[in-house]
Amino acid sequence: MDGETAGEKGSLVPQPGALGAPALGGAPAPGVRREPKKYAVTDDYQLSKQVLGLGVNGKVLECYHRRSGQKCALKLLYDSPKARQEVDHHWQASGGPHIVRILDVYENMHHGKRCLLIVMECMEGGELFSRIQERGDQAFTEREAAEIMRDIGTAIQFLHSQNIAHRDVKPENLLYTSKEKDAVLKLTDFGFAKETTQNALQTPCYTPYYVAPEVLGPEKYDKSCDMWSLGVIMYILLCGFPPFYSNTGQAISPGMKRRIRLGQYGFPKPEWADVSEDAKQLIRLLLKTDPTERLTIMQFMNHPWINQSMEVPQTPLHTARVLEEDKDHWDDVKEEMTSALATMRVDYDQVKIKDLKTSNNRLLNKRRKKQGGSSSASPGCNNQ
């Protein structure tokens, strides 16, 4: 969005020829999809030039509801199938536990381009790890970490029950509603969210008896992205630094990629010396290198460290100190996780269907033998 016109009434105009939709009256019930309002967002909201954040697909600006004066967050997306998908998935999830609520959606024109404007509750408490970093001398305990992980898990559980994989669960997408002690932690930014009910074998080019097993269950792969993220966030919560890191200064180095793929991380002292074995075991189950072996969200929520979080020991952790000491490198940590998730999404989206020539399939080998070694079969397709 061009910031210089963000605050001017009329910079966003209604879609020509469209009728105004009735007022939403707050967030839709979970799972309900609504049509965007077609009249100008500036009829209902006073827009500000204050940038609150940058989402995957667009800026997030501060705005105020004209009648109530309520401060909200406005995300502008130029219309595209990807933007529509983001709105659809977020709307479907809105109203779910620990998920940032959508208040309104508009379809307007901006500088001659159709755009979608998502008005959301304003998350004034900032990012999860910033809040821990700002605690100073006040100890952050293992029990608090367990309660935070239970809250994040509750959001993921709701999404997965709606057949949505978020696929971008990372520190900057976990925000508090306010600065108050009783603030609620919520998940936002559905720019990479994906429905998990589609069958990958609707791909026009495949041969069922040699398709790779991961292609038969793609929804497990998309959801396992979220489970891996839970493992990384839990690890950082318990010690203040990430399990995988780049030694080269690159956002994601070949060495870091290799450590992620091989699951090479440790629980070094002194930070991990007093952390419970239950917590370490849960991290191991989330950071499994084979996505199909990672815990499901139901298994995660049923783990004693999560479902009995009030009984987790109140052991003081090194987290706040480490986050404060390493705050100059925190942007690098966030960038590394962003890159790692991007790599993972690409890997899972582009799982190869083996080419017939390279497929070691008993039936095909028998057929080839009959044909005297000549391959008359049509080539398979690589979903690259």
Curated annotation (Swiss-Prot):
Q: Which residues carry this modification: N-acetylmethionine?
A: 1
Motif placement: Nuclear export signal (NES):
337-346
Q: Per the UniProt record, which EC number(s) apply here?
A: 2.7.11.1
What taxonomic classification does the UniProt entry list for its organism? Eukaryota, Metazoa, Chordata, Craniata, Vertebrata
Q: Which family does it belong to?
A: Belongs to the protein kinase superfamily. CAMK Ser/Thr protein kinase family.
What is the organism field in this record?
A: Rattus norvegicus (Rat)
Q: Which residues carry this modification: Phosphothreonine?
A: 203, 315
Instruction: State the name under which the record lists this protein.
Output: MAP kinase-activated protein kinase 3
Region listing for Disordered, in residue ranges: 1-33, 359-384
Q: Got a GO cellular component term for this one?
A: cytoplasm
**Known function:** Stress-activated serine/threonine-protein kinase involved in cytokines production, endocytosis, cell migration, chromatin remodeling and transcriptional regulation. Following stress, it is phosphorylated and activated by MAP kinase p38-alpha/MAPK14, leading to phosphorylation of substrates. Phosphorylates serine in the peptide sequence, Hyd-X-R-X(2)-S, where Hyd is a large hydrophobic residue. MAPKAPK2 and MAPKAPK3, share the same function and substrate specificity, but MAPKAPK3 kinase activity and level in protein expression are lower compared to MAPKAPK2.
Sequence ranges of Polar residues compositional bias: 372-384
- Superkingdom: Eukaryota
In terms of Gene3D superfamilies, this protein maps to: MAP kinase activated protein kinase 2 (4.10.1170.10), Phosphorylase Kinase, domain 1 (3.30.200.20), Transferase(Phosphotransferase) domain 1 (1.10.510.10)
Positions with biased composition (Low complexity): 14-31
**Sequence motif Bipartite nuclear localization signal 1, residues:** 352-355
> Record's SUPFAM superfamilies?
Protein kinase-like (PK-like)
